[in-house]
Structure formats: C-alpha cells, structure tokens
Amino acid sequence: MIKYNPAYLNLNERLSQIWLNKYTILFILAAFKLLFFSTSLRNALDVSKSYILSNCGTIDTMYSKTLNSTPHYIGVFGNYLINKALIQTVKTSLSTVSLLVYASEEILEFMVDFYLGTYECLLVAAIDGTVDTAVNATEKLIGFVNGSVGSIANDLDDGLNDLSKIINKAISAAEKVGSLFSDDDDDDDDDSSSSSKNIASVNLTIKALRNLYIPSSINDKLEKISDSTPTFDEVKNSTKNLIGIPFEKIRKEIKSINTTNIVGDPDVLYVPPINDNSNYQGICSANKNHITSFFYSMDHLLKVATIVCIVLLLIGAVVVLFPEFLEEFKLWKRLTQLREFYWYNKDLYPSSSELETINQEVKDPFNDKKNIIPDQFDVIAGYQTCFNPWHTRIVNFIEKIITYFNRSSFQNESNKRRRQWIVAYVASERALFILGIGMLAFFVSILQLIIITLLKRTFDNNSNMININSIANSSAVHSLKDDVSTWSNQVNLYIKQTEGNLNHQVFGWIEDSTESLNNTVTHMINGIDDTLADIFNGTLLYNPMKTVVSCVIENKLYTIEKSLTWIHNKANVTLPRINGDDINNLLSSSNNSTNATGSNNLATELFEDVIDDSKKIINKVIQTYHKSIIYEMIISLVFIGIWSSQIPIALVIARFKNF
C-alpha cells in the first residue's frame, strides 16, 4: 500500500500555476511569433526602401543610359539589316538576270535548231547514210569479186584445157589428111606447110583473169570519207558555240559585278549618337515622395495589423484561463471526494456514480489540510503517481540529488516534506513545460547564431573578391553574345520555315508538273525507238530511219526534256540568313567608340556603386537576423526566468505552509 506523501500541490497551489497552462503559453508564443514576423517584415520593407532611395541615382542613370543609347543601337542594328537586305536584293536581281540570259540563249538555240537544225540534221544524216551505204556495198562487192573470180578462172581453165586437147587432136588428124594430097603445086605446098606450122598446136588459157581483183584501197577511201564527214552533234555544238558567245560575255559581265559597290558604303547611313543628357530628372528621383509614402503606408498598415492581432492573441491567452480554472477545480473536487470516501470506507472502492449517492459532508477544497491523516494512504498521491509517472520520477530524482548533497539539513520529517513539496511545485507539469520551451528555444537560438556567424564570416571573406571589370566584361558581354546568337538562330529557323513553305506552296506545282512532263517525254522517246526497232531492225533502213526520226522528233523532245529539268532545278527560292557573329562584331565595334567607351566607364562606376550598396544591404540583413535571434534568445531566457521564478514562489508558499 502507498503511504501518505504530501509531495503534491493542493488546489490553491495548483491555481497559482494556472497561468502557465499550455494553451496560454501557445497564445503567448503565437503573439511573439507574430511580433517577430512583423518586425522582420518591417525591417525588410525598411531595407527595400533604403536600397531603392540610396540607388535612386543609379536607377536614374541606368534608365537615362538605356533611354539615350537605345536609338543608337537600334540605328546600328537597323543599318546592318538594311545593308544586308540590299546586298541580297542586288545578288538576287543579278542572279535573276543571269537566269534570264541563260533562258534567252537556250530559247534562241531551240528556235535555230527548230527551223534550221532539222534540215541540217537531215543533210548530215543523208551524207552519213550515203557514205555508210556505199561503204557497206563496196565492202560486200569487193568481198564477192575477190572471192569469186579466182574460182571462176580455175573452172574456166579446166574447161579450156580439155578444149585445147580436142582441137590439137583435130589439127593432128587434119595434118594426116593433108599429106594425102601431095600433088599440089609448090605454092600450095608452101601455103600448106605454112598453115600446118601455124596450127601445129592450140593452147587455150585465162591466166590474166586469174589475177583479176578489186583493191581494198577503195574501201579505205570511203571509210576515210565517212570519218571526215561531220556528225550532227559536232555541227550543233559549233552552232551553239557561235550563238553562245555574246551570252557568255553577258554572264561574265554579270559575275564580275561587285554587289557591295552597287549598294554603297554602309558608313554613309546615319547612326544616332549616344546622348549624355545629365539634366534629365530620372524616374526614381521624380517619384521619391511617392516611394516614401508607399513604404510608410505599408509600414503603418503592418503595425496596426500586428497590434490588433497581438491584442487578440493576448485576450485569447487570458480567456483560456477560465476553462483551465474550472477544469482544475472540478478535478480537485473529485479527488477530494474520492479521498474522503476512501477514509470513511477503508477497503471499499465505489464507482463514480455511487459517490453521488453517498450522504456525507462535503469538505472545503480550499482548506482541507486538517483532514489529512499522515499515517493513512493518500488517494491524491496515488493518483499523482499513477497518472503522472514521469513527473513523479523527475521529482523523486531531484529529491534524491538534493538529499545526497544536503543530508544533514533535512533529517526531520517536516523539513523533508517541505523539501519534497518545493521540488514538486518547481517541477510541476506546467513548470516543466515552461522550462522545456525555454531550453529548446535557447538551444535553437544558439544554433541560429552559429549559422549567422558562419554566414557573416564567409561574406566578409568573399565580398572583396568580386571583380567589377571581370563581371562587366564577361557575364554581361557573353550574355549579350549568347542572346544575339540565340535570336539569330531562331530568326534563321523562321526564315527556313518560310522558305520551305514558299517553295512548297508556290513552286511545288512546277516541280510536280516538270517531273510529270519529263516522264511523258521519256516514255514517248522510248516508244518511238521501240517502234523503229520493231519495223526496221536488221535492215539497211534502220539507221537512216532512226537518224531521220531523231532529226525530226527526238532531238526536239530531248531539248524539251532538258528545259523541263532546268526549270525543275531552278524553281525554288533561297532566302538570305542572318549572321549572328556579324551582329556581335558590329555591336563590339560600336561599343569601342568614344561615346560608348565613356558610357561603359559610367556603367562600370554605377555597377561598383550597386555592388557596394548590395554589400551594405546584405550586412544590414545579416544584422537584422542577428538582432532577431538575440530577441528570440531573450524570449527563451524569459521562459527560463519564468520557471526560475517558481523557486522563490515555492519558498514563500512553503514558509507559510504547515507541513
């Protein structure tokens, strides 16, 4: 059984700490948080106002510089675009003239070929065909004669030999008959002997015919004539060269034209100078009163809103004391009833509903010390031990420590109980809640101070490493170059898309038509060639007929096909592109001028002022947060002080309390 232990607080003592309840503390913390937030916000507005007003001159100068230099850079940029546009226009015009010259040359050649080329082609074809036919006939005749005469001569020789033998036999028989007439006169004898001598034998031969042949030099001469006869392509090329002489001269003249000289010197174009109007009242300086009024109205509104909210929170902190008072009163009343019931009914443990039916005297909860019997079990102490175990452990732990270091001072029972009660009062649930909040807030404030100190040290070490010139010459310049390059790339993509749409929608039908016509012409030529081959292939008329058809029809079709191909290849538009590097070089050369150099120096000085002001603002912000952390630390110490104030309060109460 748990013995009586008075190390707990009665109703009056509990009510003395009611203002330390968690709800009131939360309202107070919310009020402090709102106050700190309002203070930080007001400091931020004050920093912004100071920064704007201190940099009014810089803002005015930069605004004036931008306003005064804008016409200059617009003029530089516009003159560049005008110059490039005119150059591309001249180039396009010259290219168009060159195409017209070429088209005129081709049309003239076609007309000459159409009217004179046909007859010229037929004439050349007739000459070539005649020579080729004569060469072929001569070759066949020579081959036939030279191959046939020899065999004919041999056959004739064989026949003549047989005939000679027969004749010789006849002559021999005649001579024998003549010898029978020996009585003729001498004259006759003389004539007969002479005749006999003349036809003594007959030898018939055609040896000369055997050596008969036609020499091949005739064929060589004909081939030489065929080789020396000009073809139609040679005649056509010769005519084309004669016609193209003036046109070629015109094209050379067009190519030799310098487009830059035609456009003229771009330096003649007017570029507005960079003005330095120091008498201009800047946009910031002219509105200082409005800026100050704006920040004042913001600060006033913030101050009024903060006061109203803090008052409401403090009222809420006071209001929550009443339900806490009632709850504490009801709890103590139930506990005292339970304790008295236990005293009158030793081993009885009635339920809460049964307590209401018991007819007993209700004790005064504010003056119940006389009812405590030290040797009996205390129900309130048991309740405290069961329902607040950690609080009981903390109280016992602190009591043991005090007892260990002060054994001689607390030997009697009264002092021991007084000591236990003081520890219980100081280590009550509400008091420990205040102590925990204060210690946690103090620890967080220490961490915040460490962070802000490291930040300030890093800023102080690195703030002097900022090189104004390197920043001005690197980041801004590279940013400008990157922006110009990005702009030129995007514009070129837009131009490319427009060029594609133009070629597809305007000239697309020309490409489709020329392709279709070319296919038709090719089909016609192949059909004509196939028809000629079917009719005349393998005959002497094939080549002459093919030549005639080529002169009359196919050459014209080939010319049309070539013209359609040329139109197909030339039927497109190439729009000029923008070169970002040229623009960057132009802007760089413009920045190197006297006015621009002075303006850049002024910009560098202004940039230095901005950097210095930025450093001051950062230092001010760091100091503001440092001050805010100090305030938070003070608040945490206040909470710890509130808890510490419970010690003298407990000592005073214990001085007049009877243990």
From Swiss-Prot:
Keywords: Cell membrane, Conjugation, Glycoprotein, Membrane, Transmembrane, Transmembrane helix
UniProt subcellular location: Cell membrane
GO terms classed as biological process: plasma membrane fusion involved in cytogamy
Residues that span the membrane, as ranges: 18-38, 107-127, 306-326, 432-452, 633-653
Recorded topology in the membrane: Multi-pass membrane protein
Ranges of the Cytoplasmic topological domain: 39-106, 327-431, 654-659
Glycosylated sites: 136, 146, 203, 237, 258, 461, 473, 518, 537, 572, 591-592, 595
Protein family according to the UniProt entry: Belongs to the PRM1 family.
Name the UniProt record assigns to this protein: Plasma membrane fusion protein PRM1
Organism expressing this protein natively: Vanderwaltozyma polyspora (strain ATCC 22028 / DSM 70294 / BCRC 21397 / CBS 2163 / NBRC 10782 / NRRL Y-8283 / UCD 57-17)
